[in-house]
Amino acid sequence: MAVTQTAQVCDLVIFGAKGDLARRKLLPSLYQLEKAGQLNPDTRIIGVGRADWDKAAYTKVVREALETFMKETIDEGLWDTLSARLDFCNLDVNDTAAFSRLGAMLDQKNRITINYFAMPPSTFGAICKGLGEAKLNAKPARVVMEKPLGTSLATSQEINDQVGEYFEECQVYRIDHYLGKETVLNLLALRFANSLFVNNWDNRTIDHVEITVAEEVGIEGRWGYFDKAGQMRDMIQNHLLQILCMIAMSPPSDLSADSIRDEKVKVLKSLRRIDRSNVREKTVRGQYTAGFAQGKKVPGYLEEEGANKSSNTETFVAIRVDIDNWRWAGVPFYLRTGKRLPTKCSEVVVYFKTPELNLFKESWQDLPQNKLTIRLQPDEGVDIQVLNKVPGLDHKHNLQITKLDLSYSETFNQTHLADAYERLLLETMRGIQALFVRRDEVEEAWKWVDSITEAWAMDNDAPKPYQAGTWGPVASVAMITRDGRSWNEFE
C-alpha cells in the first residue's frame, strides 16, 4: 500500500512503554497506521522503560497488548512489518546519564525523533532534562505530552517551564485526544464550508448550546489520580472547553495551526468569570452513590477501593458558561459531564431560535426549536431536527418533527473510523500542530477553571449525591430549568 507523501521518517520513542496508555491506545493505533500504509517504511518504534527487556522481550509485550486491546485478529503479514520496527531501551528517566544509551540508538541525522511522554506529568521535567543533557532536543526533535498538564495554572506553568527549558513551542505537541475525533474535526468543515451555518452561527439565530460528555464507568481503580483531579480538572478543563472553543470560535484566517489556535484563545479569554459570588448559581457538582450500571450493582464513589470516606471530590459537573463577545452575548453554553451515568455518549446540541411569527398555531401552538446534534460518540454523525408537513388531504398544515441524519458509517460506507490516537500520532509524524493545544490555550483554560475550584473550596459546599446509573444530581436539571430550558434527552 502506498505511503502518503507527508509521512516522515521517524524514531518514535515511547516513554512508559509498558504503561496503560501505550498498551491500550498507542500500540493498537500504530498497528492501524501500519495497516493503512501510513508509516514510512524506515520509521522505527523504540520503547523506553526500567524493565530489563531486550528487543525480543519488548516485541512479545507489544504482541500481547495488541491481542488484548484490539477488536480484530492480527494479520501476520502486518505484524511482521510492524514488529521489525520495534526496539527497546532500558532507561530510568531520573538517571540523566542513562540517556546516552538512548542517544546511541537514535539516528538523528536521518530520522526525526518524536518523544512520546506516556507517563505522569511529574516525570516530564526529568525526561526533558535527560534529553537535553544528551543533546537529543535539537530541532526537528518533538515531544508529545498528554493533557491535563498539572492540577492548576501554577502547576501547569511549572511543567511547561520545565519542558520549555529544553524544547521550543514549535517542538511541543500537547494532546487532547478529543481533538483527533472525526466528528470534532468535522466541526471546522461543518461551520466554515457551509453557508447555511456560516451565516447562522451567532446570537441572532442560536438560542443556546449544550455539550455533554457522559461516562458509564466509574473511576476504574484510578482513585489516587482521580481524587486529586476530579471531573472538573479531568474533563471540563481537558476536553469540554476544547469542544466549546471549536463551536464558539470565529472563522480563522486560514487553517494553519496558529490561526485556529489564536481564535480558540480569544474564546477562552471571553469566558465570563465564575467565582464565589455566582458559583452556586452557575455550577452544580455531584458525587455518585451506589446504584446500577450495565445491569450490575456498583459501589458509590466513597465505597470504591482505596477511597477516602470524607472526600468531597466531584464525579459530575454541570456549568452554565457565558461568553462575553459580540458573537455569543446572551447565548448560554451548558456543559455537563459525569461518571456512572446511564450511557457512554458525547454530543453537542445547538438549539436555534424559533421564528418570531408562528403561522402554524392550529397545528402547533409553540413551535419546537430546530436543533443540530453533533454526535461525537457512539454512532458518530450529525442530524438536524426540523418540522415538516404530514402528507395528506387535510387542509390544515399538520406538522411533525423529522430528522435529517448523516451517519458517518453509513454515509461514507466506512466500517472503521480512525481512532483519535491514530490521527494524532500521524500528525506528530507529519509535523502538523493544528490538532494540538498551545501553551497559552492551556493556561487560559486553567485560569477560568481555577476560579471555580477555588470558589468551591471556599464555599465548602459538599457535592450533591446522585445514584449511579442516573443523569446526575437533580440540581443540574434545576439549573437549566431556571432558564426555561432542558437537557437534551438521549434516545
Swiss-Prot record:
GO terms for biological process: glucose metabolic process; pentose-phosphate shunt, oxidative branch. It is an enzyme of class 1 (oxidoreductase). The keyword Disulfide bond does not apply. Pathway: Carbohydrate degradation; pentose phosphate pathway; D-ribulose 5-phosphate from D-glucose 6-phosphate (oxidative stage): step 1/3. The keyword NADP applies. One of its GO terms (cellular component) is cytosol. NADP(+) binds at R50, D92, V93, K147. Substrate binds at H177, K181, E215, D234, K339, K344. PANTHER family: GLUCOSE-6-PHOSPHATE 1-DEHYDROGENASE, GLUCOSE-6-PHOSPHATE 1-DEHYDROGENASE G6PD. Belongs to the glucose-6-phosphate dehydrogenase family. NCBIfam families: PRK12853.1-3, zwf. This is Glucose-6-phosphate 1-dehydrogenase. It comes from Escherichia coli O157:H7. The gene is zwf.
